[in-house]
Design a protein with these regions (language model features):
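Glycan-processing catalytic domains of CAZymes
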Residues: 1-374, 379-420, 426-427
Length: 427
């Protein structure tokens, strides 16, 4: 079977210098009593990047040196010198001179790809200060990312219930003009999560849809922080398939980075040793490292959900409610079974992919997809990233997906010439 080599290109806000070349698997915070062990374990687990949110001076420079030595990318923050978190912030970066001092310190660190400037700015003065600091740092060090992350809709001020979250997220993107759009959402154990209902009525889906809309409008890569442990301590009975489902869910919406909150509570423990989900994350991180090259070439075209998603709604949810209908797809037909979601993603050459997700994080789900016409289906193999023929001349596809799992397939008309695709980064 012929293999076509298709170019893909770096992604990012055209108003910023920094561009994303590869799929990123990162984690918030560099914590651990033995930081050398921690960084080595994060590297072994398949993470490609560490983020130093809220880092002390000692932690920041210790981890920066270890990442340089061990070979792990870093988004740097030394809270004693710059940056902020919501309303609490440092005001030390007041001038271009101070920004230059920080950039000069970082310049020798080749594995440091960016600066963690602000965690969850939400008021307008915080958004403006975040923009100011990113602009100053970019002027001194334009090849590195000025990173910030938006606050989720359960923040208590800008919510879906009062109708103010969509406007907040737009202001975040318009005022800051970030190189990428990142959002965190940790749904297990908070309101709209239910033991029986799982995440069927979680506003996480509204936040993801709002992100997708803005990323499409501004041509921004979508980054998503997912929950990887029992953060809220409310008897959720947190299990790894919950994290797996959230990781795959973000990719239905076109995510180009998955941000673990947090590796020191899931991949490692606070001593820096291997943690409760080390083995599980090592497997799934390897899978995403194999899928990542293809995912970087794809844009989210549609996201379809079974009709049991978001059955409890309000008028103020309207802007984030799923509007894509299977009848709009040129690939899918019919309806989706319970707790099933499908992202339809296209590359710039017109090739079409389906990311099929079992949203049920407690049990296996048999998923039957119906196609419009006869199709040829290729699986994007999670072991090596290659496209392999899965089924020919089919009008339907039956999949068995374990709890919270997903599969990425490419679909073409059966009458077309068969070929696999490999994407090549054209810098």
């Amino acid at each position: 079977m012929e293999r076509k080599i298709l170019n893909r290109y770096p992604l990012g806000n055209t108003k910023r210098v920094w561009k994303q070349k590869d799929f990123i698997l990162s984690s918030f915070q560099g914590k651990g009593k033995n930081l050398r062990n921690a960084v080595m374990n994060w590297k072994e687990s398949g993470l490609t990047c560490v983020e130093l949110g809220w880092a002390s001076h000692e932690e920041a420079w210790t981890v920066a040196n270890l990442c340089e030595e061990i070979g792990l990318d870093l988004i740097f923050q030394d809270f004693s010198e710059f940056g902020g978190m919501q309303e609490w912030h440092r005001e030390d970066v007041r001038s271009e001179t101070m920004a230059k001092d920080i950039a000069d310190k970082i310049r020798p660190y080749k594995r440091t790809i960016g600066y963690y400037v602000w965690d969850e700015p939400f008021k307008d003065d915080q958004l403006e200060e975040t923009r100011r600091q990113i602009d100053m740092i970019e002027a001194e060090d334009p090849e590195r990312l000025g990173f910030t992350v938006a606050i989720p809709s359960y923040n208590g001020i800008y919510t879906w219930e009062n109708g103010e979250f969509p406007a907040y997220l737009r202001r975040f993107a318009d005022i800051i003009e970030p190189a990428i759009l990142s959002l965190d959402y940790y749904p297990i154990g908070i309101e709209c999560w239910e033991k029986e209902g799982q995440l069927d009525n979680s506003r996480m889906w509204l936040d993801l849809e709002m992100m997708r809309i803005i990323c499409r409008e501004k041509k921004l890569p979508l980054w998503f922080y997912f929950q990887s442990y029992d953060l809220h301590k409310r008897g959720s009975g947190f299990i790894f398939p919950m994290a797996r489902m959230m990781m795959y869910a973000a990719c239905l919406y076109g995510a180009k980075a998955l941000q673990n909150f947090t590796a020191p509570s899931s991949i490692t423990n606070m001593d820096g040793d291997k943690g409760q989900y080390f083995d599980e994350f090592k497997v799934i991180n390897r899978e995403f490292n194999m899928l990542g090259n293809t995912l970087m070439a794809l844009d989210s075209k549609f996201v379809f959900h079974s009709d049991d998603l978001l059955t409890q709604t309000m008028e103020t949810y309207k802007e984030g409610m799923p509007t894509d209908k299977i009848c709009d797809s040129t690939v899918l037909d019919g309806t989706l079974p319970k707790r099933t979601s499908v992202g339809e993603l296209h590359d710039e050459y017109g090739n079409k992919y389906l990311f099929v997700l079992n949203r049920d994080y407690e049990k296996e789900n048999e998923i039957k997809l119906s196609f419009k016409g006869e199709k040829r289906v290729y699986v994007v193999d999670r072991n090596d990233g290659e496209q392999k023929l899965m089924k020919e001349n089919c009008s339907e596809l039956v999949l068995k997906l374990c709890a919270g799992d997903a599969i990425l397939v490419r679909v073409q008309d059966a009458g077309e010439e068969a070929f696999a695709i490999e994407y090549k980064l054209e810098a």
